[in-house]
């Protein structure tokens, strides 16, 4: 199993590095067409940083591991919110522009409702639901770009990189190589994640919820740290909410459209026979998002107690995966 752990770690590194190359190449190409920064940021960069999750979930679904696809989406949302956003809130609480949070919050809970329909009522994620998720994603992207064009001051402005001097051929190479590296990393992650799960005697869902989710959430962690250093903690939190929408409608949408899967039934709450995904994991996902969003919208500020409570929930969530 040691070799599988090493290859799993290599897969994570390839995912992250491949994502960086893909974003650099795609951003460079997009800017050659003089697209506004907000359009580039809301489309190319956002999709590029979510590509690792897309590839992992899609690879898992195509290989018959619905648990990996399912767990990665939910786990990434919990990790983004209760760990990454929580760190940002604890380090830099204060007033926040709630107007920019409303649209992604509405889309998140609407998409979560669709997710709950599949999980609690249907017991499966049919292909038509994948198409609906992708349709929601398109609408969300259009509204995000329109809002950014109307309110350019609220948009995130990326610093110009030295890479601007790259040739078109180099940018195309970064795009293609980045996508290929992500694909290889995703394959390693899924294959050896399954082996590690068997070796540890835990369901694949646990590996996806904790280790895979944390690894694929590292780009959001980097964004949050950058926002903290520049004194824009609320920007980091906004990026997290947007990333969570992507996890529900883009990551799950692509995976379900290509390879529909059933809700995993391999992990049960103690000896009750209750599916952990339904009675624990989805409620935690909805709970941490509610804890981050609703008090903030009501008070128009991020409070340190929110961050501390979210961190406590994340630690408890991780422990419970091995105890319950």
Regions found by a protein language model. Name each.
Residues 1-324:
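Hydrophobic alpha-helical segments, chiefly the membrane-spanning helices
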């Amino acid at each position: 199993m040691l070799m599988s752990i090493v290859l799993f770690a290599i897969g994570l590194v390839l995912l992250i590095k491949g994502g960086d190359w893909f974003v650099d190449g795609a951003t460079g190409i997009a800017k050659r067409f003089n697209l506004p920064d907000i359009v580039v940021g809301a489309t190319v960069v956002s999709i590029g940083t979510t590509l690792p999750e897309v590839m992992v979930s899609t690879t898992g679904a195509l290989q018959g591991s619905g648990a990996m696809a399912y767990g990665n989406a939910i786990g990434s949302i919990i990790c983004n919110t209760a760990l990454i956003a929580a760190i940002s809130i604890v380090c830099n609480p204060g007033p926040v522009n709630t107007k920019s949070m409303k649209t992604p919050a509405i889309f998140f809970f609407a998409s979560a409702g669709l997710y709950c329909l599949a999980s609690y009522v249907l017991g499966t994620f049919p292909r038509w639901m994948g198409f609906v998720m992708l349709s929601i994603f398109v609408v969300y992207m259009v509204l995000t770009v329109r809002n950014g064009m109307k309110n350019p001051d609220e948009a995130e402005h990326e610093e110009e990189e030295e890479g601007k001097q790259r040739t078109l051929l180099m940018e195309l190479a970064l795009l293609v190589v980045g996508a290929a590296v992500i694909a290889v990393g995703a394959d390693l992650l899924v294959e050896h994640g399954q082996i590690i799960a068997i070796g540890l005697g835990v369901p694949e869902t646990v590996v996806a919820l904790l280790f895979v989710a944390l690894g694929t959430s590292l780009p959001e962690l980097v964004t949050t740290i950058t926002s903290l250093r520049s004194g824009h903690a609320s920007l980091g939190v906004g990026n997290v909410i947007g990333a969570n929408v992507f996890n529900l409608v883009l990551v799950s949408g692509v995976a379900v459209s290509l390879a529909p899967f059933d809700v995993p039934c391999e992990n049960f709450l103690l000896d009750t026979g209750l599916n952990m995904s339904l009675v624990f994991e989805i409620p935690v996902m909805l709970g941490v998002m509610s804890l981050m969003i609703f008090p903030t919208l009501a008070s128009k500020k991020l409070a340190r107690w929110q961050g501390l409570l979210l961190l406590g929930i994340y630690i408890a969530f991780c422990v419970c995966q091995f105890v319950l």
